[in-house]
């Protein structure tokens, strides 16, 4: 069997109706568009969100919030991720080398999620209270 010899089962693919091909086809003349009006014209129709002149929903509702630029360069690291880092020192460069965070990340915080299995030294990262306790309980240390 070859890919170029495969074909769908007989009768499983029904041909689409061809529009504007005579009265007997059932879709001749107006081709399913009805008579006149904006939607019958070529390229006709209203833009997305248009409600016939009524104030549209997206303009009735208030704007809110913003996207923090700092959030784009900040990452959360789980305790379980620390096991994937080569060596005993965990810092930004080690996390980037292990593909745990992206290259654009400038700040990171270790959070208590999962468990740390070996002693590691966390350098230059922020650490939550729970994560700090877990790292120190495993024999590791945190350097600011």
From Swiss-Prot:
List cystine links: none
- Amino acid composition bias (Gly residues), ranges on this chain: 21-31
Q: Name one GO molecular function term.
A: rRNA binding
Name the segments for region: Disordered.
1-54
Q: Which domain of life is it from?
A: Bacteria
- Keyword Ribosomal protein attached: yes
An example Gene Ontology cellular component term from the record? cytosolic large ribosomal subunit
Question: Any one Gene Ontology biological process term?
Answer: translation
**UniProt entry tagged with the keyword Ribosomal protein:** yes
Q: What does this protein do?
A: Binds to the 23S rRNA.
By sequence similarity, the record places it as follows: Belongs to the universal ribosomal protein uL15 family.
Q: What is this protein called?
A: Large ribosomal subunit protein uL15
Q: Which organism is it from?
A: Klebsiella pneumoniae subsp. pneumoniae (strain ATCC 700721 / MGH 78578)
State which gene encodes it. Answer: rplO
């Amino acid at each position: 069997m070859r890919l170029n010899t495969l074909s769908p089962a007989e009768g499983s693919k029904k041909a689409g109706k061809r529009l504007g091909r005579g009265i007997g086809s059932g879709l001749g003349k107006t081709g399913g568009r009805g008579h006149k009006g904006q939607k019958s014209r070529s390229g006709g129709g209203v833009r997305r969100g248009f409600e016939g002149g009524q104030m549209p929903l997206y303009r009735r509702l208030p704007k809110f919030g913003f996207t923090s630029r700092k959030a784009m360069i900040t990452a959360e690291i789980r305790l379980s991720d620390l096991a994937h880092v080569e060596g005993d020192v965990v810092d930004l460069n080690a996390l980037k080398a292990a593909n745990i965070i992206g290259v654009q990340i400038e700040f990171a915080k270790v959070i208590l999620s999962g468990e740390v299995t070996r002693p590691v030294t966390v350098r230059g990262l922020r650490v939550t209270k729970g994560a700090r306790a877990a790292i120190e309980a495993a024999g590791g240390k945190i350097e600011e």
